[in-house]
Design a protein with these regions (language model features):
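Conserved N-terminal subdomain of the carbohydrate kinase-like
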Residues: 23-115
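Residue-level marker of alpha-helix boundaries and capping positions
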Residues: 4, 29-30, 121, 125
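Conserved beta-alpha-beta core of the PfkB/ribokinase-like small-molecule kinase fold
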Residues: 110-127
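Alpha-helix C-terminal capping segments
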Residues: 12-23, 45
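Short secondary-structure boundary/capping segments within folded domains
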Residues: 4, 16-19, 73
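Gly/Ser/Thr-rich beta-alpha loop segments that engage phosphate groups in nucleotides
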Residues: 9-10, 117
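Short pre-catalytic strand/loop immediately N-terminal to key active-site residues, enriched for Gly-Thr
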Residues: 1-7
Length: 127
């Protein structure tokens, strides 16, 4: 049985805040394909603003992938297992030097980064 849904640490925080009535905006780079667009639609349907979201082209991110993770739910004494597949995703391959971070963050009171996701980006030193 296979079930697909969207999530991830930073997206989950934005969703939780939006559900509490806090104005939340999510920034990332996703491929400009049905998977990337679906992820953006799902966030927007849950009241998360995605205006600064970058839909990358194959020229900008040659692998043109959405980072994924797979959860195999445990049963009984067998624990659940998570497999991450983020390498060469649109986010990690996009040239973040193209992003005006000052303009992107203008007007926001809080910035939430978590986990290792920003470190996967090839242009992470910009962050």
């Amino acid at each position: 049985n296979f079930e697909a849904s969207y999530g991830g640490s930073e997206a989950n925080i934005a969703l939780a805040l939006a559900n509490l009535g806090v104005d939340s905006t999510f920034f990332s780079v996703v491929p400009n394909n049905s998977l990337g667009k679906s992820a953006v639609r799902w966030l927007r349907s849950n009241d998360v603003h995605c205006t600064p979201m970058i839909l990358s082209t194959p020229e900008e991110t040659p692998t043109h992938r959405l980072g994924t993770y797979y959860l195999e739910t445990g049963y009984g004494i067998r624990p659940s297992k998570v497999t991450y597949d983020r390498k060469h995703s649109a986010f990690t391959e996009y040239d973040l030097s193209k992003v005006d971070l000052d303009a992107l963050l203008d007007g926001f009171d809080w910035l939430h980064l978590s986990g290792i996701t920003p470190l996967w980006a090839r242009t992470a030193p910009i962050l």
